[in-house]
Amino acid sequence: MSHSKIKAGGHGSSGIGNDFTPAKTPAPATPAPQSQQVNDLLGRGVGNALNKSNLGSDSQTWTPGSTMVSLKSRSSSSHKPDTGGDTKPDSTSGGKRKRDDETDPNAETEGGKKKKKRDDENDSSQAGGAGSSAGSSGSPEDALMNIALQRAIQRQTQTRQKMQEAMKIKDDDD
């Protein structure tokens, strides 16, 4: 098996070279993964797909870091509900996170009812002086943090629901 791979990858002894430059093997040997890369772009975010494809570290030179970071954080947090990854990209990406909220149709449709309730909770907590209420009137940082917290809470509730649904399905199977 290893012989055929080396032959497909290049010319005879260049198998050693392929070990150092893996970018050469996927293109000639397996043309199929390109569609998988496109799926990665759509499904998991640009950052992951670029890291898997030939571009790798070059991508950071021409892709603005903030958009890659925000896409990565969205994709990783959908798998694990911890909010640790969310706080960092928000501080660097400026207003981009806000634009994500407006253009993301899933956020509105999936958690529409929950979102309304959460807005009420946020309003009441601000009125009660929950620390950030003093500065939230003017500073965009607080507005961004509120959005980040809302999205983190929304993600947690969504993942919790998915877990519960999965448990129900498991129970049905048993």
Curated annotation (Swiss-Prot):
Bias kind Low complexity: ranges: 66-78, 147-161
Task: Locate the compositionally biased regions of type Polar residues.
Answer: 50-65
Task: Enumerate the subcellular locations listed in this protein's record, separating them with semicolons.
Answer: Secreted
GO cellular component annotations of the record: extracellular region
Tree of life domain: Bacteria
Indicate, by first and last residue, each region the UniProt record lists as having compositional bias (Basic and acidic residues): 79-89, 162-174
Report whether Secreted shows up as a keyword of the record. yes
Region span, Disordered: 1-174
Keyword annotations for this protein? Plasmid, Secreted
Sum up the protein's function in the record's words: Probably involved in host-pathogen interactions.
Protein name, as recorded: Protein PopB
The major lineage groups are:
Bacteria, Pseudomonadati, Pseudomonadota, Betaproteobacteria, Burkholderiales
